Structures are given as structure tokens and as C-alpha cells.
Amino acid sequence: ASEAVYHRLLADIEAASGTRLRILPDIIAGASAGGINGIFLAQAIETGQSLEPLTALWLDNADVDELLDPDARPARALTKFWATPLVWMAARRPGDAVERTVAPDTREEVRMKLSRFIRSRWFEPPFGGEIFSTMLLDAFDAMAATPAGPSLLPDGHPLDLFVTVTDFDGHVQSLSLNSPPQVIETEHRLSIGFRGRGGSASGFADPAELVFAARATASFPGAFPPFTVRELDRVLKRRHRAWPGRDAFLARVLPRRAARGEAEDAVLIDGSVLANAPFAQAIGALKNRPSRREVDRRFVYIDPKPGHRSIHLNREGEEEAAPIGENAPLPGFFRTIFGALSDIPREQPIRDNLEAIDRHSARIRRMGRIIQALRPGIEAEVEGAIGRMLFLDRPTPARLSAWRGKAQQRAAASAGFAFPAYAHLKLSGIVEDLAARLFQLSGEDAPMMREAYRQAIWKQVRAIGADQLTEDAGSAAAPVLFFRTHDLAFRIRRLRFLARRLAETLELEADADSEAVQAMHDAIYRALALYTECEGNDFYNDHVRAAAAQVPTDAGAALEAMAQARGLRARDEAADMLLAEALANLPKAGRRTMLLAYLGFPFSDIATLPLLQGDAVDEYDPIKVDRISPEDCTAIRAGGANATLKGIEFNNFGAFFSRVYRENDYLWGRLHGVERLLDIVISAIPAPTRLPEGALRNYRRAAFLAILDEEESRLPHVADLIAGLREEIG
């Protein structure tokens, strides 16, 4: 099986480089068909269920004969009898698409389905929405019925799923301007999000909610009718199936309409109309990712047909280069309309998203260089503040707390006039995070109320004097007390910084005491978990939510409720116990390295937080972007999508007309996927210890053959292709 190839690869990487690699897909985003795949993938990762039912759904049911609405089917052979000669001429002329791309023994099947499709109802979507919703629900039920393995995420690790949807009528949003103070605009983009946690007993989401998201994001205009919640209600009613969280779900994904009692009236169409590559949601989910190891964060996006437009019209129905030159004709009437309304937005490049990721990565690289340059001076400052006894005394929780206080005072004094600027930036980040968290917990969603929350929290902060920031503030000063009570982000940054220092020093030293280093590693991440659990909205109880709803009138009570719920002082004591014990058991040199990093963090933070513009960076590694596409896969066959895929025919709807097409594209998808994933996994290892190119070729060959062995019995219609691929692979 292909799983055995991956297992062997990870074992060989560990043997060759000493790196234990684990791959965690923990952020998934998609639109349209990619949204459906993402939803099922997230369900499988979170629950440990098999994806085999989704494969069966695609191969068996993604067919025009299965998807045609019963009311749209030609009632009898004479329905639109006058269209039959047109179909016959289009499908039988020499060199037509059917003759060129379909195996001889299935051409009649494709032609018959094409005939029924063209003779179905016109000027209305031919495919049935309720049929589609039922198929999706059947697939989730089939997944639940199969034996499940364990969750594929560590216990408590978050999994974020996003799919985009287009609100056909749009929903009103207000914008704040200078003049007039407020304007109204209509927003059509929607993002439906789900969050699960590895090992959670509550499950990922109700299958009805996942069907809602899948059906809505893949409601391709013209092919399927627009989706409404009433459609799903009818499907569930026919199956006598309850949806206990219906109202809460609709209030979350359609808050404005639900507040007016109009959620059932929302008309939703394909998410790729306006947001075909939802990178923005995935980028947003990067904040507050709990990394239990050093992270090589990859954004992997899948583009099965780069350069192939979803809707392409020309006289011959075939792809052709755009005419150029002085006498080149302008796009015609229908081509202009289709391009402007659907094709161009759908194919919009992802340059803006990738540039945002690149800027994020550049800031992290710059920060790393600055920290490395500052380290000798910072270590000298720490030794000067605490003295030589730092490395002679055994660390205890009390000593660690006292040393930390001295180091922070020294950092503030050494920073001089730069410290108030840093402190104000840090204060601003805390207040904005508190305001945003309380706003989310309140259930409000109006932009004007969001601003009211900000103003109320800031007013309370000023009232208690927490904004009176100077470098010589005593331990009882209002700003210091406020930071101790509410500065969650600083604590998380410090522990991630310590984890990073451990990974780049002691964990790389062959002569380090492995048990002590592992214990230090575990202590850091257990301490980190004490704080990161406060970052999810599901951490906060009804008391905090009730206080959050009263922020505009009593911000002080809301801040007190947040402080009590988080209990950062108690968490500090627990973290100190974990770290002190682990530090005490390290060899002397290793203990010195870790103590200097931990106590020196306030110096580093003063230097780097302004560089990051106040944004906390949870993963201290640049983000890399990889693509999986037929164009990038040449190990078996060059030529990209044109040389391998069948479904790109018929304006990318070819796979709906033949199981041969679907089996072909499914098989090539697996082969292309494993080729690129092997490339990506191996590239995560530093170049000096990376496996040689010959080893990569061997892994590819083994994986290709394993996939062919797995799929041969399931894909009888492409037996000739499989035999030919065995020869090509060698």
C-alpha cells in the first residue's frame, strides 16, 4: 500500500538526518469541488473515518444520468426530437471530442448521455439540488458506517476548515468613513468555517452542517439550482433526520439574516464565483497555531488544470490561442458576458495572497537575523542583572520568578526612551485582542458595535491608569498589574522563543543528554498548552459570555471576568514548576543556554515586536508555498493536464459523461499527488542531510506501483491505462 511507502520514507529520513518528521494537515480551505474535497478530508482527519465512500461517490454517482433532476429529464424518446440530429452531428463528426478522447467501447455511452443531457430541460439547471444534497449526506453516512481509526491530529490540536460561498442577493454591511460617518454596501462573499480538535469527543460537526457547506460551495451556476436551507430541510425531513443545532448554525454562518428571521431566504451559489482560492482564510488561521515541535509550515494549493478556463466558448468548442495583432477581433457578445460575470472572477490569480505570505515570511527572516545579532549583548545584560549565581543555583519556581522579574526590569531600563513605545505597542495589542475576543463572545456582529467595544475597553484601561507607561514603573504600578493579569500573548511568545532556541541548539547536539533534552522539550510545550487553551472561544463559559454582552456599559466587569477565567497568575506558577524541574535536570551548559534564552526574551521582544507591528508570531519559520498540479509532475509522463486528464473536455464537465473519464482522472490525481507530496516531504529536510535524488526516484516508483496495485480492481474501465503506466514507470 502507498501508506507503507510514506512510513518507510519517514523512517529513512529519521535514520539519515535524526529528524522525526510528522505531517499534519491542520488548515484546509477550498471552494466549489475543492471545497467538497476539503470538507470530506477534514471530516476524515478529525474523526479517523475512511475516505473510501467519497471515492465511491465520485466514481459511481458523479454522472449526468445520476445528477439530472427528475423534472429535467427528457420524458420520452420524442422529447426535443428535433435536437437529436444536432446531437448526432456534433457527437459523430470525424475527429470530434468523443472520438478523440473516449475509448471505443464507451463512445456510445458518452453519446447517449450527451443526447439525454442536451434534450433535458433548457434555461433551467439540469442537475437536481436535492439529489446532490442526498448524495452528500449518503457519503457522510457511509463514512460513519465504516470502521474508524484514531484521529489523525494530536489531542487538542485544532483543525480549521473554510469553504467559500457566494450570497447571490448579498447582505448589507456598514462602513465607517469621515463623511458621511457611515455608508452601506452589499457584500456577496461568505466564508463558512468549522473548527475541530484532535481527540475531541464532541466530533467535528453535524453532517447536516457539512452537507450545507458542501452543497452551497459547489452550486455551480447553470448546472445546479442555487442552494437554500429549505432544500436541505426537505432532504432531512424525508429521511426523518433531526438537525438539533440548526438555528445556532444558521445564526453563525448567516448572522444578519438569522437575526431578522430570514436565514431560509438566503440564496447561495458556488463559492468560486468570487473567491476561487481562499488563501485569506487560511492565512488568518495561522494566528495562534499551537506548535508542539519545530514547524516547517507549508501552504499547499491544488490546481488540477492551470491555464484551462472553467468556461471557454469558441466556434469549434475547442481550446485555441487568443488572436493578437492589429486586426485581431474583439471578444464576442457572449464571450464578453461569460468572461465578465463568471470566468474572469473564477480564474483570478492568487498573486495578492502569495505576496502577503511572502511579506510575512520576510518579516520572520528579518526578525531571526536581528535576534541572532543581538544575542551576545542580551546574554551579557542578563548575567549583569542576575549575577554569577544564576548558573550556580539550582532553578526553583521561586528563583525562576525572581530572576524573570530582575531581567524584565533590566530590559526596561536598558531600552531607555524606546521602552514606552514598546510598552504602548504591547498594550495596544492586548487591548485590541481583548476587545475582539469579548466582541466575538458577545454574539454581536455589527461593525459599529465592534468599534463601541474597542472604545469601551480603551476607556476602562485609561480609567485604571494602565496606559501610564514608563521604564521605571514599579511592580505595583497599574500598567504592570494590567500586563500580569492580561498579557497572554507575551507569555506565549516567550515559550515559543524558548522552544525555538532548544530546537536550534540542544536538540541538534549529538552529545546532549537526550532524556533531559526531551524532558525540557516536553516541559516547554506542556507550559505552552497552559496558555494556548485560553485562545479559543470555546474555552470561555457562560459567565464570561454574559459579561461580554455588557461591555459597552460595564467594561470593567468584562475584563474582570476574562481575568478570572484565564487565571494567568496560577498558570504562571504551574509553568514555573514545569520549567524549573526541566532546567534543573539539564547538563550545566545546556541549562545556561536555556536560562539565557528564557530570561533574555524581554530584551529580544523589545527589539522585535515593533518590527512585527505588534503581531504575535507563533511559528518562527517562514511559510513556504507549494503547488500540486499535473504541470509539475513529469516523473511518469510529461505534458501536464492535456496529456493525462480527460475531464477537462466539454468545458471541464467531461467527467460527468463517462466513468472512464472519472476513473482516469482519479488515478492520475493519486499519482500526481503522491509524486508532489514526496517532493514536498523530502524538501523539509535540510540540504546537507537530505536523501539523494536516486532515493527519491525509488520512493516514487514504489509509490506509483503501490497505487496501481491498490486501484487495479476498483478501476476496471482503465485497465489498459494501468497496464501502460506499469510499462512507463518501469
Feature map (PLM): residue ranges:
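Patatin-like phospholipase
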Residues: 1-141, 175-178, 182-188
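Short helix-terminating capping/connector loops at secondary-structure junctions
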Residues: 17-24, 148-158, 261-262, 291-296, ...
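Catalytic or ion-translocation cores adjacent to nucleophile or general acid/base/metal-coordination motifs
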Residues: 51-69, 275-277, 284, 291-355, ...
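Non-catalytic, alpha-helical, charged scaffold/linker segments
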Residues: 62-77, 105-109, 334-574
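Acidic, Ser/Thr-rich low-complexity intrinsically disordered segments
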Residues: 81-88, 410, 415-418, 422-425, ...
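Active-site gating loop/helix substructures
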Residues: 112-123, 156-288, 332-335, 437-485, ...
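Long, C-terminal catalytic modules of enzymes
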Residues: 360-392, 645-681
